[in-house]
Design a protein with these regions (language model features):
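Catalytic Tyr-X3-Lys loop
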Residues: 94-113, 157
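Amphipathic alpha-helical dimer-interface segment in Rossmann-like NAD(P)H-dependent oxidoreductases
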Residues: 68, 106-127, 166
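Catalytic loop of short-chain dehydrogenase/reductase
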Residues: 95-98, 130-156, 161-162, 166-169
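Active-site loop of short-chain dehydrogenase/reductase
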Residues: 71-73, 87, 123-136, 170-174
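C-terminal helical subdomain
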Residues: 177, 197-239
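Rossmann-fold cofactor-recognition segment
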Residues: 42-57
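N-terminal Rossmann NAD(P)H-binding glycine-rich loop of SDR-like oxidoreductase domains
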Residues: 9, 17
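Conserved mid-core segment of classical short-chain dehydrogenase/reductases
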Residues: 81-102, 146
Length: 239
């Protein structure tokens, strides 16, 4: 299986590269620079594509060219940026610069669509094509979050997923949107799960849990798929 992970240099993306795949599979990471401290066993092939999704068209072309020869089975789009004051009581839309709003829309929405458009012909050649979009609980109704550009971009991901399903259902394209709550991205996958789960005292999700969910999705047969999954922290009162 050839798996492409966009936004793979740190946090959840890095954990996905380290934690997914079986012997003989190829993991392809995408980020502006390859991280130096990846922990990957020798049984899986890891490649890297350096691309900056803040320049959507150029990045999409670069990534397409890098994976065209060997093909692609799964695209995991894990890239997203947010307002400088996001998740801070000081956040206010009126204080968010226009350039910041435009950058969020470009990176979180435009880049997603353009890259999928470029890679879709390759994906549809696979016997089991899959797209996994890492969204957010900020993209759910009554999320309780005020960040306008970030929230709108996560609602957009659900719309992208829904439209792709309708357009390519007969080609058996499986599209999943993961609505993730507050993640603990500072504790790496190499940390024992019981220790990682203590961080945040029930208010944060260890990356281990998300990796386990994605493993489950990738283990399904071609006869079914996970349409949408919401994964909040256990003490997140919004859900």
């Amino acid at each position: 299986m050839n798996i492409l992970v966009v936004g793979a240099s740190k946090g959840l993306g890095k954990a996905l590269i380290e934690g997914l795949g079986n012997a003989g599979d190829t993991l392809i990471g995408v980020s502006r620079m390859r991280p130096e401290d990846l922990i990957v066993d020798a049984e899986r092939n890891v490649r890297w594509v350096e691309a900056d999704l803040m320049f959507p068209a150029k990045a999409a072309h670069t990534i397409e060219q890098a994976v065209a020869e060997d093909g692609l089975d799964t695209l995991i789009y894990n890239l997203g940026i947010w307002e400088t004051l996001a998740f801070d009581p000081a956040y206010a839309l009126l204080d968010s610069p226009d350039e910041e709003v435009q950058a969020i829309v470009s990176c979180n929405i435009t880049s997603t669509i353009l890259l999928i458009k470029r890679l879709l012909p390759l994906l549809l050649k696979s016997a089991h094509p899959r797209i996994i979009l890492t969204g957010s609980t900020s993209g759910l109704p009554q999320s309780g979050r005020p960040e306008v550009a970030f929230g709108a971009s996560k609602f957009a991901l659900r719309g992208i997923a829904d439209s792709l399903r309708e357009g390519y259902r007969h080609q058996r394209l499986a599209v999943t949107c993961l609505n993730l709550g507050y993640l603990n991205t500072e504790v790496p996958l190499s940390t024992p799960l019981d220790l990682a789960a203590q961080r945040g005292e029930g208010q944060m999700i260890p990356v281990h849990d998300v990796v386990q969910v994605v493993r489950m999705i990738l283990s399904l047969s071609a006869a079914s798929y996970v349409k949408e999954l919401t994964l909040p922290a256990i003490l997140d009162e919004r859900f």
